[in-house]
Amino acid sequence: MAAKEVKFQTDARERMLRGVDVLANAVKVTLGPKGRNVVIDKSFGAPRITKDGVSVAKEIELEDKFENMGAQMLREVASRTNDLAGDGTTTATVLAQAIVREGAKAVASGMNPMDLKRGIDLAVDAVVKELKNNARKISKNSEIAQVGTISANGDTEIGRYLAEAMEKVGNEGVITVEEAKTAETELEVVEGMQFDRGYLSPYFITNQDKMRVELEDPYILIHEKKLSNLQAMLPVLEAVVQSGKPLLIIAEDVEGEALATLVVNKLRGGLKVAAVKAPGFGDRRKAMLEDIAILTGGTVVSEDLGIKLESVTLDMLGRAKKVSIEKENTTIIDGAGSKADIEGRTAQIRAQIEETTSDYDREKLQERLAKLAGGVAVIRVGGSTEVEVKEKKDRVDDALHATRAAVEEGILPGGGVALLRAVKALDGLKTANNDQRVGVDLVRRAIEAPVRQIAENAGAEGSIIVGKLREKTEFSYGWNAQTNEYGDLYAMGVIDPAKVVRTALQDAASVAGLLVTTEAMIAEKPKKEAAPALPAGGGMDF
């Protein structure tokens, strides 16, 4: 076991504080509408330019082990806020740095660290309650666009696309962000349920220009096993032919004789038909077939349920207004399933999302929910260079999370003002002793840090801005760093999601409280590298 180095009390806290400052100072330059960029060197490819706090934090690794511990603890604040709210990482970092600094001063002057932490926790709970009481529910599309614009660092185009996407697919819908092949940013919305399986034979194609199969008002047969001959299906096929409607077959696979028979029937014009493979694998495939059945009002033909292919009748087939099949995906539009059944299924999937501990499973369940509840929107981010596209994509991701958070818990005045106003909740707060009171006051001072930093990044004097804001008591009265104006921030469109502000404060206080109560630090001693031995003389005669 390698030898360890141990640091205590002031020495430990000083080193840790140095690490905290290095990381926070690199991250906080990105805060606010006039925040600057950070350039990150990459071992391969072009350097990365970003204004995303968590991306900067994740890149920082310090040589001194003790300083690095402080930096990594602070990085945890940014990562946690990013995981929970998806934005507000820079605000959380700035708050954590301010609380740690104030806390370290208090501990150095002889205060009890545990009581300080209790005071910090009391203050944070009171401020969070005040924030929740003042949060305003988001209703209008324009407000969603404003939240998106602010999180994308003032890019109105991104805000507009996000608002449009959320309007089209709903709050439950999946919105994905991809890199575009062109210089333009564009939005594509897939309405209905889409899954990534295409036609099994190009002979099924009905629209030669677009190379796709289009079936209007088709019947849909959902079968979980392979189909290798059609003998068992003949009764239902005859019934479909008599109805004059097209047929879509979704099965594990359609092969050999079965596929050949379907193709021949299609080419002769006897039956408008297309076949696709079922999406997913294993248990997920069963669940997705059940989703399709509920969406289309059909029944899954499954031996588990005791349903044989021979006994399938027309009323067991699903229906949809339209089905469009391309080489690699199938879209079912306007399924005929009952609204109550679809709502029941979405409630069941939501419950599974709550229970699951796996991020992968959660993502897949959310995709299934979106396909049932709304649709899928894809924002393709374009730019002139790869570096620009990556930087813009970071901002779109932030903005997407922020708009979701805003819909979830409402909005607050932006620019750090909500925290500044919520401080009044600390006025009547009762504490058990003086050290806890110092912990509360410490949060009162630290909470000004985001406003001060936004002002500093915009080239203004933080203390003057804070002083002017304190003169007015209205909750939404603040300073717009973009235009250098004072007024109602809601009216100016300077708003933050309540969830982002709340999460930033709670995560910052949580990690800062741990740092303040740290009394000893242990790290591996750096190994002393032995000087390389000189090569032996080669016995040369002169």
Swiss-Prot record:
The keyword Nucleotide-binding applies. Belongs to the chaperonin (HSP60) family. Transmembrane segments: none annotated. Signal peptide: none annotated. This is Chaperonin GroEL 5. It comes from Rhizobium meliloti (strain 1021). It is found in: Cytoplasm. Keywords: ATP-binding, Chaperone, Cytoplasm, Isomerase, Nucleotide-binding, Plasmid, Stress response. NCBIfam families: GroEL (TIGR02348), PRK00013.1 (NF000592), PRK12849.1 (NF009487), PRK12850.1 (NF009488), PRK12851.1 (NF009489). The gene is groEL5. ATP binds at residues 30-33, 51, 87-91, 415, 496. GO terms for cellular component: cytoplasm.
